[in-house]
Amino acid sequence: MDLSGSLLIAMPSMADPRFERSLVLICAHSPDGAMGLVVNKPVEDLSFAGMLEQLNIPRAPNGRDIRVHLGGPMERGRGFVLHSPDYMSVGATMLVSGKFGMTATVDILEALARGQGPSSALMALGYSGWGPGQLEAEVQRNDWLTAEAPSELVFSDDDPGKWTGMLRHMGIDPLTLSSTAGHA
């Protein structure tokens, strides 16, 4: 099972409070483990413009402003830009299922600061990581629902509504979603 490009939707029974009502886009998944970015938990006290200022990256008057999210509990000082596939930095951009790109170099920050770069993007500080078999076990334990990731929802500005919106997109009423599940 390769979940690359899939969206993990935290179940109401999620035991880890860091992932409560989280949506995680899986960027890489292999027998060695998985890596993903939470796409609906904005960092409240840091704007993209503020981050550019901290990094001494000049922002043009037409510079883009993207949302900064907490991508997960791992390496929170490291930044990743999840973006539409219309931007590629040779040797630095990882394509995720053809619908997304992920770039973790200063080039994309500079492009966005100049008003260039991908048509859609969000910044993530840190990432979510799983060791070999760990994510599969969490899915089997019903910690997560999995679904194809709609790019319009991933890049939506409605961070508080993304979790509910994704469930509705799947035809699930969040009010009737049980916090326990069984196996047939």
Swiss-Prot record:
InterPro entries tied to this protein: AlgH-like
Report the record's disulfide bonds. none
Q: Which GO terms describe its cellular component?
A: cytosol
Q: What is the name attached to this protein's record?
A: UPF0301 protein RHOS4_26140
Family under the similarity heading: Belongs to the UPF0301 (AlgH) family.
Q: Where are the transmembrane segments?
A: none
